[in-house]
Amino acid sequence: MLKRTSKQLSMFSSLEDMLSHQHPLFQLSNKINWECFENAFSPLYCSTNGRPAHPIRLMCGLLILKHLRNVSDEMVVSQWSENAYYQYFCGGLEFMPKQPCDASELVHFRNRIGEEGMELILAESIRVNTDHDDEDHFDTAFIDSTVQEKNITYPTDAKLHKKIIKNVLKIVHDKSLPLRQSYTRTLKGIYRSQRFRNHPKNRKKALKADRQLRTIAGRLVRELERNLEGKKGYENMFELYYKVLSQNRKSKNKVYSLHEPDVVCISKGKEHKQYEFGNKVSILRSWSGLILGACSFRNEYDGHTIEKTLEQTQRMTGRKVDKLSGDRGYRGIKQIGQTKILIPDTPKTKDSYYQKRKKHKLFCKRAGIEPTIGHLKADHRLSRNFYKGVKGDAINVLLAAAAYNFKRAMRVLLYLIKRISIELVSTGFMLKYSF
């Protein structure tokens, strides 16, 4: 059930009067159309029963601030109680020296609005940057793919087998099931033998310990399956465990994590990081540096990600991209609908000098999407995804792209404020009357 939000100002102090109207976060909060979030997400709540929920603007604002400031759920809730600009951004009318909600409520809100709600936030971030703007952001765009790494440890068979044994023993202990042997003392020796496996003298011993660990894990799983009555609620768990125990080096569609079984292994040819474990994301950036699309995939060929990314951009903005430039990883596709796909290639003999220079400039400009991806990873939480499952993969990349666009709008607003102030001061107009 939605809680009624009061717009009654405080009799003694107003949060708006306390703050500087020149602050970029203050300016951004007045430029975002919060009513579109209210209208879109209100039907997701029950209007007749249940505890009154927190305001939609508060929850949306916290999600935006989290990726804008690159902090966790717990940290953004804690900072909200200390920062007056955060509270005004989330619709506060007076300063509240306490946390607005529990950090876990952000998890429920993300699951409630889903991927469609995140696309609405990204669409609003695009509108904030393009509203009343004469520049054509949809004439030429650039596309590139990167890996969004999942929050898992580096996967090895031994680590997975250890976790299987630990989980099985926990279920046996919680349900007081009979167990012929727990292998407690045996496992200590096996773990010791697996240490320092890279030393030439320990290699053979470590490989033998790996085989013993797999055997013990299989025994415990089979014994648990026999002792559990009906296996109700554990079917998926046993299926996952047997898949992990049966996979080898040449297996297809491997499981790299027990709590994130959808993670895939991607090799992008990097010297410092040969393999990355997560999922592939596609980023579409305009000529002016605005992110127009952000889609999540498994490990598809780059050329097969273009169509879905263009559809998302058209769905959010109602506009079509005329020309799309990508690197040589997108070879094989020349046109999708009305959008021409431009890939770097050997210059044609029939091209004039002007055409060659124009293409060269376009492909040089395409490289500008690389630092954009770098900022998404370093500043907006794209480098490591902490959200759960395939749904969390899509949510994280959409929120990171939206935060990037909102930060761009804040820089533009700050630049305009400084420029107007300098011009007014140069003409002799006092700065305190400027705003």
Go through each PLM region and give its residues:
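Charged, often Cys/His-bearing segments associated with DNA-binding zinc-finger transcription factors
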Residues: 1-32, 411-435
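Helix-centered, glycine/charged polyanion-binding patches within enzymatic domains
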Residues: 322-391
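Acidic, metal-coordinating catalytic cores used for nucleic-acid/nucleotide bond scission
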Residues: 49-54, 84, 325-333
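Basic, low-complexity intrinsically disordered segments
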Residues: 40, 45-52, 59-60, 67-134
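Active-site- or DNA-interface-adjacent structural scaffold in DNA-acting proteins
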Residues: 93-262
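Flexible, glycine/threonine-enriched loop-and-boundary segments that flank and lead into catalytic domains
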Residues: 258-273
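Short, conserved catalytic/metal-binding motifs centered on acidic residues
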Residues: 23, 60-62, 76-77, 102-106, ...
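Electropositive, glycine- and tryptophan-enriched low-complexity nucleic-acid-binding patches
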Residues: 270-316
